[in-house]
């Protein structure tokens, strides 16, 4: 099983999370791709995709993702296992918290992918409904807030990595 971790990062937080995820899952399994430098077409060569997207300003897509957003429509991702993680500021921008994560999830849902890594909303304060499912009980991916809950990020990343490994194993069983 080969995993490609694709991310966009303007302030390095999404990139730092990518490196932590790679280190936990294993550098022999996970290859990092900064969308600033690498084409999204590379996603097609992986069995598993981990995609990191921060939300900018008032619910906007980060610039590296925005530059390749339309290219995602042309990719063949049918049957791929996809785990998402997002970065945002739940207190300063609660009504747009992780909107980009929700937009990416909705875009990929049309591509026939299998999602893993939904994450509980408990412990977060926000009002946006874009990044949630299950009557608001789950985020569509790991939710990270380096502005207000940086002290929880390492534990959340560790727990989420264990969770997605278990869910991936079920898909391959």
Curated annotation (Swiss-Prot):
Pfam families: Flavodoxin_1. Keywords: Electron transport, Flavoprotein, FMN, Transport. Coiled coil: none annotated. GO terms for molecular function: electron transfer activity; FMN binding. Its cofactor is FMN. The keyword Ribosomal protein does not apply. Residues 3-165 form the Flavodoxin-like domain. Belongs to the flavodoxin family. PANTHER family: FLAVODOXIN 2 (PTHR42809:SF3). Low-potential electron donor to a number of redox enzymes. This is Flavodoxin 2. It comes from Salmonella typhimurium (strain LT2 / SGSC1412 / ATCC 700720).
